């Protein structure tokens, strides 16, 4: 089977609580992770919750990256979905894990868009 893309679902534990509650820093980390993976950033939207927590999305030409943080638990839920062969979602995921100072993570990789024959998609 041939996949259109790879979707990394990451559970990050033991993260730096101050980082998890800093909207500007979370946004910077997410955008930098996309760029380090070789993605082309299109749109960025992040929100700081009261009293704590940040959620955000980085829309890339190749799909998206998302994060939802729970500073009180030292936990972040991260998705990195990339289409095509040019961008490596693991580079982004590993960078995010390092920058959030996670003590450990669990991940699942899902192949998205499975076809029996290779599919040619424009710009990927």
Swiss-Prot record:
Cofactor binding: number and manner: Binds 1 pyruvoyl group covalently per subunit.
Pfam families (alphabetical): AdoMet_dc (PF02675)
Pyruvic acid (Ser) sites (modified residues): 63
Keywords (A to Z) from UniProt: Autocatalytic cleavage, Decarboxylase, Lyase, Polyamine biosynthesis, Pyruvate, S-adenosyl-L-methionine, Schiff base, Spermidine biosynthesis, Zymogen
Top-level division of the source organism's lineage: Bacteria
Cofactor: pyruvate
Assigned protein family: Belongs to the prokaryotic AdoMetDC family. Type 1 subfamily.
HAMAP family noted in UniProt: AdoMetDC_1
Protein name per the record: S-adenosylmethionine decarboxylase proenzyme
Organism name: Caldicellulosiruptor saccharolyticus (strain ATCC 43494 / DSM 8903 / Tp8T 6331)
Gene name of the encoded protein: speH
